[in-house]
Design a protein with these regions (language model features):
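Conserved catalytic or regulatory cores that recognize and/or transform ribose-phosphate-containing ligands
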Residues: 1-104
Length: 104
């Protein structure tokens, strides 16, 4: 989990917005890491839940100070929130979520 994603082509804000929504538009579910604050991730979760109406798994590390109250307080049935303590726990949460939502 220490590797970082870097685009080989620099993108501006509009390009990032379009790319990310295109990814969500082509998705059957969403997995979001929410251990730290991110307006962008919150926007993507809301888009997935309320526009695309697809299931979302929001995962956070047990040592996270706190997750967003907007995420934690959301009672949408398509939103699953799971805490993890290590990589194996994270992978198991993801596998279970995918299996429960029609994945392989």
């Amino acid at each position: 989990m220490s590797s970082k994603f870097h685009s080989s082509i620099p993108l501006n804000a509009k390009q990032i917005y379009s790319r990310d929504l295109k990814w969500l538009d082509g998705s059957k579910l969403m997995i979001a890491e929410v251990s730290g604050p991110s307006l962008g991730v919150g926007f993507e979760i809301a888009y997935a839940l309320f526009h695309k109406k697809i299931p979302v798994l929001a995962v956070y590390h047990e040592k996270a100070d706190q997750i967003s109250s907007m995420i934690h307080g959301c009672n949408d049935k398509k939103l699953t929130i799971k805490k993890y303590n290590d990589l194996d726990d994270l992978v198991n949460n993801i596998k279970t979520f995918i299996s429960n939502n029609g994945g392989n």
